[in-house]
Amino acid sequence: MNLTHLDEKNHPKMVDVSQKNITQREACASGKIYMSKEAFEAIITNTAKKGPVLQTAITAAIMGAKQTSNLIPMCHPLMISKVQTHIEENKEECSFKLFVTVKCEGKTGVEMESLTAVSIGLLTIYDMIKAIDKSMQITDIVLESKEGGKSGKYLRS
């Protein structure tokens, strides 16, 4: 297997994308956070002491997408043109599922930006509600879809 982030001496390197074409890139990732009923109720009734949890998580997810190249060593800085979030609440499971779609025109994809955004958004929920429930679980952070670039479309089955 040829790993593009390693040189011939197995040293890490940032991939040279200068010869790649600029194309539309889009990726969507998702993840879930499970919590106690008390924590879930505090979020949906907007009574958490740290403020509006879901709105803050959305803002954090957007910031996370924009900061990806500062957090993941081999990621290129990108001119992101769109970050869109969607949160599904599941009362029976006491969980929230966060979806983040990131879009840009560039020479490299935005998969890492969408995955980072989901991670930061869910971590923000954890941070804001941990006084009520320290046993929350963040799970199932996955790439749902991507399109653009040489590898084409991907859709999680």
Curated annotation (Swiss-Prot):
Asked whether the UniProt record includes Nucleus among its keywords, one would answer: no
Does the record carry Lyase as a key word?
yes
Please give the catalytic activity noted in the UniProt record.
(8S)-3',8-cyclo-7,8-dihydroguanosine 5'-triphosphate = cyclic pyranopterin phosphate + diphosphate
Binding residues annotated for substrate, in chain numbering: 74-76, 112-113
Q: Which UniProt keywords apply?
A: Lyase, Molybdenum cofactor biosynthesis
Question: What are its E.C. numbers?
Answer: 4.6.1.17
Q: Which GO terms describe its biological process?
A: Mo-molybdopterin cofactor biosynthetic process
Among Pfam families, the record links this protein to: MoaC
Q: Which GO terms describe its molecular function?
A: cyclic pyranopterin monophosphate synthase activity; GTP 3',8'-cyclase activity
Pathway-wise, it operates in: Cofactor biosynthesis; molybdopterin biosynthesis
Assembly: Homohexamer; trimer of dimers.
Function field: Catalyzes the conversion of (8S)-3',8-cyclo-7,8-dihydroguanosine 5'-triphosphate to cyclic pyranopterin monophosphate (cPMP).
Cite the HAMAP family for this sequence: MoaC_B (MF_01224_B)
* This protein's name: Cyclic pyranopterin monophosphate synthase
What species was this sequence derived from? Campylobacter lari (strain RM2100 / D67 / ATCC BAA-1060)
Q: Which gene encodes it?
A: moaC
